[in-house]
């Protein structure tokens, strides 16, 4: 039972003023611009866009600024704004094979067509605090080193490269996913509620906007023995992909821009079943921006959730689609947990009365000890 109450209007307005002051901080300190957030906190921006289901770096930066860095609150703001936007059409499926690659690695093949492209990554840093970053560059001209780094990043983009999983496909060693007859439109979770059992397309939608921390924990559990799969990173790629529309009025597709994406294809050994030969199976992850950890966790959980269709026993939480999909959304989780701090006066009073009555009844039933 939820009890709706109306608080004092003046108190609420004052609370909102205090919130704005706390968000701004010391007025003597220069305020963050959206460009600074977008450029220098790009990984946070990518997470907000992914879990907010809206690709717009400027709006994601605004949401982070308004939420004072609270990622889940920023995701809430972006999703709320998304509901106000008109839907003008649908793009054709993104062609990640045609990605302009900034980073591309494989843990399964050392020498692969197009080569390993390290790109920007924390993987080879020492995880030591860089105190050079404490320098306040306000009013300073860009250093030659900074200009050189920017030029290097610009030159680092590589053209389309073949998918690593295609190498296994050439030998027939990895499962294929043919397009279903009629190519039915996938269930749209942004317009229709989640229903069980959910097909893979619906599960992938849920995981794509699911909480990164939750998916990371679920993916981690699959590596600690709670499933029987041994994953390998077939390929992780990060770069830009064209968004293409095919308007009915035109006889040709039209590129309307490009977006940054991270894609992960995880391969797992599969011993085979009564209908399928031994082969490698796939787990898939896709996220906006540079979001490798999210894409990897998503691909691990995707593969775990495929246990029933592959004839595997469903024994662990990561394999139970109702458990995973019902608890992956951080807005639902945050809302349900945080509603506990709202007034529950009537609920608590009823339980308080009940506890008092139970204690009184227990006192009457307990025999009194004989006096000495």
Give the label of every model feature segment.
Residues 144-372:
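Acidic, serine/proline-rich low-complexity intrinsically disordered regions
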Residues 2, 55, 90, 122-124, ...:
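Sequence-level detector for tyrosine residue identity
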Residues 76, 95, 101, 106-109, ...:
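A ubiquitous, low-specificity "background" feature that marks scattered single residues
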Residues 55, 85, 112-116, 175:
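Short secondary-structure junctions and interdomain/linker hinges
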Residues 1-50, 99-119, 123:
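N-terminal, Lys/Arg-enriched amphipathic/low-complexity engagement segments
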């Amino acid at each position: 039972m939820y009890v709706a109450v109306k608080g004092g209007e003046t108190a609420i307005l004052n609370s909102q003023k205090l919130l704005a002051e706390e968000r701004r901080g010391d007025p003597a300190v220069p305020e963050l611009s959206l460009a600074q957030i977008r450029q220098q906190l790009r990984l946070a921006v990518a997470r907000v866009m992914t879990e907010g289901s809206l690709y717009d770096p400027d709006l994601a930066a605004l949401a982070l600024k308004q939420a004072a860095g609270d990622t889940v609150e920023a995701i809430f703001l972006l999703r709320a704004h998304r509901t106000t936007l008109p839907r003008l059409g649908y793009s054709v499926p993104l062609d990640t094979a045609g990605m302009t690659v900034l980073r591309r690695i494989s843990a399964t093949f050392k020498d692969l067509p197009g080569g390993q492209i390290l790109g920007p990554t924390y993987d080879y840093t020492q995880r030591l605090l860089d105190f050079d970053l404490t320098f306040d560059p306000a009013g300073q001209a860009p250093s030659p080193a900074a200009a050189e780094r920017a030029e290097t990043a610009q030159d680092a983009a590589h053209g389309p490269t073949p998918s690593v999983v295609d190498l296994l496909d050439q030998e027939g060693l990895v499962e294929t996913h043919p397009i279903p007859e009629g190519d039915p439109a996938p269930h749209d979770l942004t317009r229709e509620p989640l229903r069980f059992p959910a097909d893979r397309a619906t599960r992938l939608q849920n995981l794509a906007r699911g909480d990164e921390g939750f998916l990371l924990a679920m993916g981690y559990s699959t590596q600690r023995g709670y499933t029987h799969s041994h994953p390998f990173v077939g390929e992780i790629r990060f770069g830009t992909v064209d968004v293409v529309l095919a308007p009915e009025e035109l006889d040709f597709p039209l590129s309307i821009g490009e977006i940054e994406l991270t894609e992960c294809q995880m391969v797992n050994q599969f011993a085979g079943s009564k209908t399928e030969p031994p082969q490698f199976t796939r787990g898939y992850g896709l996220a906006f921006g540079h979001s490798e950890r999210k894409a990897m966790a998503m691909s691990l959980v995707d593969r775990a959730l495929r246990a029933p269709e592959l004839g595997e026993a469903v024994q662990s939480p990561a394999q139970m689609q109702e458990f995973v999909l019902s608890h992956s959304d951080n807005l639902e989780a945050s809302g349900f947990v945080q509603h506990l701090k709202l007034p529950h006066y009537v609920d608590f009073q009823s339980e308080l009365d009940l506890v008092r009555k139970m204690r009184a009844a227990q006192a009457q039933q307990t025999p009194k000890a004989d006096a000495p």
